């Protein structure tokens, strides 16, 4: 069933953005505030699974604990007509994966991008959050060259350096090494 044209609370779904392990992401219009947002919808089959709903809510809380210019912001955790969804900052631009496919990124630009990614991860780590799925597809580069790290769906809160991390349930375990 297509979500395009449907309204969830005050958000009118405009277009698909992408699909991941924990849901679909759409561009939407916040009809109260008049701004474009991203809506991450928990699939109907997951909404019946208490563990998946809890994980979705945990993602929202972890993301809400982060406030950094290089991390995509969350505006809310909502439910409308039995549909659970996150309201997120809409980040325009290509993913880093898209930019890499176009060809080599000049060294000077690569250093600027890497610095911004490191700052985002440092801010998350200072709040006790490890992304666990950092990869070029989860990093947006705005037209102005600003990095936004997205998709904290597999993020884990940790108590400190002594805690052992269990990455065995990560669907993109091969990307985990970049975060260690």
Q: Where do the language-model regions lie?
A:
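Conserved ATP-binding/catalytic core of the eukaryotic-like protein kinase fold
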Residues: 1-180
């Amino acid at each position: 069933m297509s979500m395009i044209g449907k309204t969830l609370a005050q958000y009118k779904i405009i277009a698909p953005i992408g699909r991941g392990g924990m849901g679909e992401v759409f561009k939407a219009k916040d009809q109260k505030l008049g701004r474009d947002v991203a809506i991450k919808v928990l699939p109907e089959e997951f909404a019946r699974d208490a563990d998946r709903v809890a994980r979705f809510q945990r993602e929202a809380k972890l993301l809400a604990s982060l406030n950094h210019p290089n991390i995509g912001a969350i505006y809310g955790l909502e439910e409308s007509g039995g549909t659970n969804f996150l309201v997120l900052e809409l980040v325009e631009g290509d993913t880093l994966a898209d930019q890499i496919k176009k060809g080599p990124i000049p060294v000077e630009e690569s250093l600027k991008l890497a610095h911004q990614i490191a700052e985002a991860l440092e801010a998350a780590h200072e709040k006790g959050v490890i992304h666990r799925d950092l990869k070029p597809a989860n990093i947006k580069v705005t037209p102005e060259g600003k990095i936004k790290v997205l998709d904290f769906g597999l993020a884990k809160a940790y108590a400190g350096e002594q805690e052992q991390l269990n990455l065995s349930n990560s669907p993109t375990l091969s990307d985990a090494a970049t975060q260690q």
